[in-house]
UniProtKB/Swiss-Prot annotation:
InterPro entries associated with the record: RNA_methyltr_RlmE (IPR050082), RNA_MeTrfase_FtsJ_dom (IPR002877), rRNA-MeTfrase_E (IPR015507), SAM-dependent_MTases_sf (IPR029063)
Protein name in the entry: Ribosomal RNA large subunit methyltransferase E
Keyword Methyltransferase part of the UniProt annotation: yes
One Gene Ontology MF term: rRNA (uridine-2'-O-)-methyltransferase activity
Keywords for this protein: Cytoplasm, Methyltransferase, rRNA processing, S-adenosyl-L-methionine, Transferase
Function recorded in the entry: Specifically methylates the uridine in position 2552 of 23S rRNA at the 2'-O position of the ribose in the fully assembled 50S ribosomal subunit.
Top EC class of this enzyme: transferase
Location(s), subcellular: Cytoplasm
Length: 221
């Protein structure tokens, strides 16, 4: 009975969620687009000409938002966007116009090579401007296990950013408050000159999710 009440409550909240309604009206696949939108408007992350990698992209709302921003550039002509968006996820994703999607686990060598090849082609052999990560683990409810899973995904995003970002680039990751949160923030501070925490209004009040933004890579000795 308790589970049914929970499901009914979630469904009621979801149906009446203004961000869900807005996403349906504006053609976004998920309300998560407005989390990125709010952070982008505050921090000016997405700019014309950028090469952007979206980790954990499915169902694709962050890629949609990034693509739309690049399409708004005065230099976007002949149906092409001004820049590039490369998305990757373990799960399948319906195509997004102008977005290159790779389905697979980028921890696997063959998938990682494909990702690197696509990124190099998109950037003209240069490094990338922005890494987005909305990756989230399946939470077990066991605090210590969940903290380890969350930290692991953040570590993957940090490692990818360290290897592929331009010095002036940025990394935005989803995280959750918990026992490992402070360690993740410290890792960001070791890797980036500027670190900020963001809790957009589109994040549900009941959710412990937050976003960590790192900008300007520190020089690795």
């Amino acid at each position: 009975m308790a589970k049914n009440k929970f499901n009914h409550s979630w469904l009621h909240d979801h149906i009446n969620d203004p961000y869900v309604k807005m996403a349906q009206r504006e053609g976004y696949r998920a309300r998560a687009a407005y989390k990125l939108k709010e952070i982008d408007e505050q921090d000016k992350l997405i700019r014309p000409g950028q090469v952007i990698v979206d980790l954990g992209a499915a169902p694709g709302s962050w890629s949609q938002y990034a693509r739309n921003k690049l399409a708004d550039s005065p230099r976007a002509r002949d149906g092409r966007i001004d820049g590039a968006v490369v998305a990757i996820d373990l799960l399948p994703m319906e195509p997004v116009a102008d977005v290159t999607f790779i389905q697979g686990d980028f921890r696997e060598e063959s998938v990682f090579r494909e990702l690197e090849s696509v990124v190099l082609d998109a950037s003209g052999g240069n490094k990338i401007d922005l890494v987005l990560s909305d990756m989230a683990p399946n939470l077990s409810g066991v605090a210590s296990a969940d903290a380890a899973r969350i930290e692991y995904l953040c570590d993957l995003a940090l490692e990818f950013a360290q290897a592929h970002l331009k010095p002036e680039g940025a990394l935005l990751v989803k995280c959750f408050h918990g026992s490992g949160y402070s360690q993740i923030v410290e890792k960001f501070k070791r890797q980036f000159k500027v670190v900020a925490k963001r809790k957009p209004k589109a994040s549900r009040d009941k959710s412990s999710e937050t976003f960590i933004l790192g900008r300007y890579l520190k020089t690795v000795d």
